[in-house]
Amino acid sequence: MAIPASRTQSEATVCIETALCTGCGQCVAVCKDFGLRLEGGKACLALHPLFGCVGCGHCMAVCPARAITVHGRGLGPEDLFALPPLSSSASFDAYYALLRRRRSVREFMPAEVEPELVERILDAARSAPTGVPPSDVNVLVLDSREKNRAFASDFCAHLKTLGWLTAPWFLWLMRPFWGKANDGLFRNFVRPALAAFTSSMDAGKNIVTYDAPLVMYFYGSPWADPADPLVAASLAMLAGEALGLGTCMIGSIHPLLQWGGSAARFRKRHGIRCKSREGVVVLFGYPGIHYNKGIERSFASVHRA
């Protein structure tokens, strides 16, 4: 048995060099598939793992004797690397300052984002945790203002095929099925937003993706944990901030690319591999406006049980 993913339908294989094993038991402790056990002072495979090895690599990474290797599900011993020293990590104060300085930026300088910065952002995003490995996150990269404008223009053309979605008759019909909250969302946000997107694009102004010089669209797959692309996008956004770029998350594009023939044709034209439950677009670029003050944010609630 194996947990399926778009990249694999098989479980990974754990190999143990018994002669090297010291019997410390750390691999047994970290395996949450319960696929390892100690026998005779040595690590060995358990008879009844929970799922079959998912390829997280924890056992291989924790072993002090290099006695364990994991192969499969996109993972191999060549993927191990030495951890950076703790002294090189950001302090909480530095991290919190980054968060406090961050604002959603929608005004960008025309300068492109250098290719090496694009790769550093992707490297940071790849480090995101996943619900179950291997990652089923896909990323569409638009690395110029021209590519961004073409994508946004085509998106607005797609929106024009969805007029029924915010038509009064459709909202009236759906009100009993999707409830008061969704009805209010569609009437007060979706309908005016779609109208503004298309009318502004017709007038030559892009208020969908704001002609940012770099756009990344993070999305999953039918097998992905819904949170995975959102977590990866968040790390990409923070990486962009750390590199001196302005960033902005755009959540209005993904939901409108999931259903119907027009959406399927749009996905095919732009190399979007599949539908997914969650996804988000992140804009990057050198900011055209710099803020002098921050604004305090809050949660809807914090309940301490």
Please state what every model-predicted region is.
Residues 1-305:
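Acidic, surface-exposed loops and disordered segments
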